């Protein structure tokens, strides 16, 4: 399994990751919004750190671009 990125509690890192994935897959914000069922504003707001999306909301654009979100336990946390 190839890991494309990691969503964390850091709103800036999450926004940058979503933007990078979108650019790597050659989607415009509008195209991604339409394909994922989000508004163009919602995609923009995540990418520019205005919103911290719930996991379900973050998964929608990722899935639309062909990515899955995998949940993995952090080392040392049991």
What feature does the model see in each segment?
Residues 16-34, 60:
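Short basic helix-loop element that most often maps to the first helix and adjoining turn
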